[in-house]
């Protein structure tokens, strides 16, 4: 269990044991501006709004997007069904294809999304096999060498700056630590060795045979901060953090993946500025924040791979 100090942000997770599959909800009752960066060949995304009251991450591939509808309905119920334009509760969702790791057709539905929201509490995140990470896996060059992952999170506070990273890694690639060691995925049980998929691909090309890779892979994530950024800065922040995840997941953003990152700001604090801290639309502050957030996200990826 990760404990974090981020007022106004609650997280809940729920799952169906008979799946197993689940959903994870990041609830920000006041709402927060959001940038979405989606890449890869098979993105599963709904909403994609630039302002959200909740982000729903779920298993179940496209069917699991129903969980987000459950979150939306529950928020409407909490508003006693008021539908004024200014009161609309916006929910964006992203899903992973987790059917590879299980033999059932169970998927996160409206009831499960609603349950994840009901379980949302401030300051706590269930790590590992919980929520959307129930049947996540990594290193799917050959299914016999695939390993189960989970969901991971990391938090960092620097003065008034708060950064929370949440991730459900379900990639074709492997999880790699800062020493360059493969720590999850593509595991040979006979030798006890995990190896980088590039070696499998090189061997296939050398033998003039098509490389083997399992279909149905996705990594979904969210990076939440309280630092105010312009729309341009927030979009670049999302791209910077998402791109940095290539270090911890290799390969990443492939045609066999469908990766989505939500960058969320609660717009509560401003970083100090000087005449030299920006160049037109370019911001040194946002770049520095993105660099720090990228490390927090790598920590979250490693937590998910434990």
Curated annotation (Swiss-Prot):
Task: Provide the protein name.
Answer: Putative NylC-analogous protein
- Species for this entry: Agromyces sp. (strain KY5R)
What is the organism lineage in this UniProt record?
Bacteria, Bacillati, Actinomycetota, Actinomycetes, Micrococcales
Where, if anywhere, are coiled coils annotated? Answer: none
Q: Which GO terms describe its molecular function?
A: aminopeptidase activity
InterPro entries registered for this protein in UniProt: ArgJ-like_dom_sf, Peptidase_S58_DmpA
Additional record remark: This gene may not be expressed. The 25 amino acid residues corresponding to the N-terminal region of NylC are replaced with 76 residues derived from non-coding regions. No potent initiation codons are found within the replaced region of nylC'.
Signal peptide range: none
* Organism domain of life: Bacteria
- Entry's CDD domains? DmpA_OAT (cd00123)
Record's Gene3D superfamilies? L-amino peptidase D-ALA esterase/amidase
UniProt record similarity statement: Belongs to the peptidase S58 family.
Q: One Pfam family name from the record?
A: Peptidase_S58
């Amino acid at each position: 269990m990760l404990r974090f100090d981020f007022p106004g942000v609650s997280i809940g997770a729920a799952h169906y044991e008979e799946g197993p599959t689940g959903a994870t909800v990041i609830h920000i009752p006041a709402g927060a501006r959001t940038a979405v960066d989606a890449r890869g060949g098979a993105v599963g995304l709904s909403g994609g709004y630039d302002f959200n009251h909740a982000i729903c991450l779920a298993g179940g591939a496209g069917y699991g997007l129903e969980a987000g509808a459950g979150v939306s309905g529950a928020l409407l119920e909490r508003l006693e069904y008021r539908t004024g334009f200014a009161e609309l509760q916006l929910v964006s969702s992203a899903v992973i294809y987790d059917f590879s790791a299980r033999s059932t057709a169970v998927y996160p539905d409206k009831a499960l999304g609603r349950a994840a929201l009901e379980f949302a509490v401030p300051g706590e995140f269930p790590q590992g096999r919980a929520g959307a990470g129930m049947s996540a896996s990594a290193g799917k060059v050959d299914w016999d060498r695939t390993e189960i992952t989970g969901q991971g999170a990391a938090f960092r506070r620097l003065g008034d700056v708060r950064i929370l990273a949440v991730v459900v890694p379900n990639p074709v690639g492997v999880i790699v630590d800062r020493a360059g060691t493969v720590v999850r995925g593509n595991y040979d049980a006979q030798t006890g060795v995990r190896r980088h998929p590039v070696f499998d691909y090189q061997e296939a090309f050398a033998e003039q045979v098509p490389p083997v890779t399992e279909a149905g892979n996705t990594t979904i994530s969210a990076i939440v901060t309280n630092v105010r950024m312009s729309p341009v800065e927030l979009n670049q922040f999302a791209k910077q953090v998402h791109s940095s995840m290539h270090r911890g997941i290799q390969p990443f953003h492939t045609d066999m993946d469908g990766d989505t990152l939500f960058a969320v700001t609660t717009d509560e604090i401003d970083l100090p500025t000087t005449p030299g801290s920006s160049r037109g639309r370019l911001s040194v502050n946002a770049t520095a924040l993105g660099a720090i957030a990228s490390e927090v996200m790598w920590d979250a990826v490693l937590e998910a791979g434990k």
